Amino acid sequence: MAAKGAREKIRLVSTAETGHFYTTTKNKRNMPEKMEIKKFDPVVRKHVIYKEAKIK
């Protein structure tokens, strides 16, 4: 059996408070800090910062 991987599913939530989010994975060993990335929010039709949140 293979060992469990270091990648974990995360949710990127818009800081524009629209409720829009993206899902992705990240490697916890290489990036232990919370991820912040600028992506397009189709609700406000602008690029905004998305912050990492746990998937429930």
Curated annotation (Swiss-Prot):
A Pfam family it matches: Ribosomal_L33
GO molecular function annotation: structural constituent of ribosome
Signal sequence range: none
One Gene Ontology biological process: translation
Tagged with keyword Ribosomal protein: yes
Key words of the record: Ribonucleoprotein, Ribosomal protein
Superkingdom to which the source organism belongs: Bacteria
GO cellular component, one term: cytosolic large ribosomal subunit
Record InterPro entries: Ribosomal_bL33 (IPR001705), Ribosomal_bL33_CS (IPR018264), Ribosomal_bL33_sf (IPR038584), Ribosomal_zn-bd (IPR011332)
Keyword check for Zinc-finger: no
Family indicated by similarity: Belongs to the bacterial ribosomal protein bL33 family.
Protein's recorded name: Large ribosomal subunit protein bL33
Gene: rpmG
